[in-house]
A protein has these predicted regions:
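Binding/recognition "hotspot" determinant
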Residues: 1-49
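Alpha-helical membrane-interface segments at transmembrane helix boundaries
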Residues: 33-42, 77, 93, 126-129, ...
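Hydrophobic alpha-helical transmembrane segments
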Residues: 42-54, 142-149
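Short, well-ordered alpha-helical packing segments
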Residues: 45, 58, 73, 77, ...
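Hydrophobic transmembrane alpha-helix segments characteristic of membrane transport
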Residues: 48-80, 171-187
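Alpha-helical transmembrane segments and their helix-start/interface "positive-inside/aromatic belt" motifs
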Residues: 65-89, 192-202, 257
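Non-cytosolic segments of integral membrane proteins
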Residues: 81-173, 202, 206-262
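Alpha-helical transmembrane segments
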Residues: 177-197, 229, 259-261
Length: 263
């Protein structure tokens, strides 16, 4: 019974963590979200873009006595840039997403077992006498439950990151519409620039998550060792610590991605 519980906990955790890679590259809802954005958000974004352009015209008119033809040309060019940006924003975001997906696909996790296998622990438990097995029941249940919860939390974070990407795709026309605001002062509008960095950070987040999983897959085998003094209880605690450390790294990966891109 204890052997089945431990095996199930390890297998479930390893499978969940491996499945996170599939979740992070899932774009099945992309087209639906884009279509919804075009019908709901795009008209609002066009209105905002026009208001921003009119505001820029008024600000320019206040600074000069007459609006020269050069200023008119700049306004028309700016209007064209905003219009093209609104039209091409899904393709820009898709290109950023595809780059991250390509990187994630290169980090194959199908054969990655962050906790390794439970054979050594099971062999140790099978060698225990019945009283010792009965005493070990509660610790085994608690630690196995903790391992599974840690795996589910990692999968939850992966789905959360996917929803974050899709929400950004849905609202994308709104921050792009502010591109014209302040453009006469040079550079990209702060709202637009912030949005692009946040979206890129969300894409990078998935890649960093997979890097964390790969790193732990490489080093976890040296962490959990049934031969270390303390017996099966210490070994199970080591396994739980590995799962929780992995969870902590995955949680922290979001802030790492944002700090890299200053988002």
């Amino acid at each position: 019974m204890l052997s089945d519980i431990i095996t199930g906990a390890f297998n479930i955790y390893n499978w969940i963590v491996s499945a996170a890679g599939v979740v992070l590259t899932n774009d099945g809802a992309w087209d639906m979200v884009f279509s919804l954005s075009q019908s709901v958000i795009y008209p609002v974004a066009l209105t905002i873009a026009v208001i921003c352009l009119l505001y820029e015209v008024s600000q320019t008119a206040m600074k000069v006595d007459t609006i020269t033809w050069e200023t008119g040309v700049r306004l028309m060019v700016l209007m064209a840039i905003v219009r093209i940006s609104l039209h091409w924003v899904p393709r820009m975001l898709r290109a950023m997403w595809s780059t991250a997906v390509g990187f994630i696909n290169n980090l194959t996790v199908a054969d990655n077992n962050p906790l390794g296998n439970a054979d050594a622990i099971i062999q140790y438990i099978d060698g225990l006498r019945l009283p010792a097995r009965m005493i070990a029941t509660v610790p085994v249940l608690v630690v196995s439950f903790a391992i599974i919860i840690a795996g589910l939390a990692i999968l939850f974070i992966a789905y959360g990151r996917l929803f974050e990407i899709l929400i950004y795709v849905f609202v994308a026309p709104l921050p792009i519409a502010f591109l014209a605001l302040g453009s006469f002062n040079g550079g990209i509008n702060r709202i637009t620039g912030k949005f692009l960095r946040l979206f890129a950070a969300a894409c990078l987040h998935g890649a960093i998550m997979l890097v964390c999983i790969q790193i732990f897959g490489a080093i976890a085998g040296n962490i959990v060792d049934v031969s270390v003094g303390g017996g099966v209880f210490w070994t199970l605690l080591q396994s739980a610590f590995v799962a929780l450390i992995m969870l902590g790294a995955v949680i922290k990966s979001g802030s790492w991605a944002k700090s890299v891109l200053d988002a």
